[in-house]
A protein has these predicted regions:
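Conserved Nudix-box catalytic region and its N-terminal flanking loop in Nudix hydrolases
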Residues: 23-61, 161
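Nudix hydrolase/Nudix homology domain
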Residues: 33-38, 102-161
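A generic structural micro-feature
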Residues: 6-10, 37, 83-89, 106-109
Length: 161
């Protein structure tokens, strides 16, 4: 990395995570820096915008979905790995949206869709998306009883009344 890339001011960016029935909304990027990769809807901040405002604006621009109640989920310092890259400070928010809103790709999103974590891991995704989905999966309560409880027969929910 050259010294010019090191001294440039980082750009602020935000993205929005929306979960619906165990699926997460992703867009396929049409433009660099992540062209043809899948990511949460998001992008660069405009002057005077808070990170939460950026996440909601980018969500609406890229998918047509109006989000609300953004809650900071994770932050990333995305340092460039070559001279042409830009340094970003990325804020990722969990966002609420009406369940009947359809995602329609627009702006710099070439496509939009809802994906399970397993499907996401098979797609070309930035490391930040992989990390967020792994963290979300760890936070999500299991819908299956543990194998240990099944083997030992100690889980009271498994016993007949």
């Amino acid at each position: 990395m050259n010294s010019d890339a090191m001294t440039r001011q980082p750009q602020l960016a935000s993205s929005a995570i929306i979960e619906r029935d165990g699926r997460y909304l992703l867009v396929r990027r049409a433009n660099p820096p992540s062209a043809d990769m899948y990511a949460f809807p998001g992008g660069r901040a405009e002057p005077g915008e808070t990170p939460a405002e950026t996440a909601l604006r980018e969500l609406a621009e890229e998918t047509g979905i109006c989000g609300r109640e953004p809650v900071l989920f994770e932050t990333y310092d995305l340092v460039p790995n070559h001279a042409e890259s830009r340094h970003f400070l990325l804020s990722v928010f969990r966002v609420e949206a009406d369940s009947d809103c359809d995602a329609v790709a627009s702006d710099d999103a070439a496509d939009a869709g809802w994906f399970t974590p397993e499907e996401i891991f098979a797609l070309p995704i930035p490391e930040s998306v992989r990390h967020c989905v792994e963290k979300l999966a760890r936070m999500r309560p299991s819908i299956h009883p543990s194998r240990d409880a099944l083997a030992s027969g100690t889980d009271s929910d498994l016993m007949d009344p």
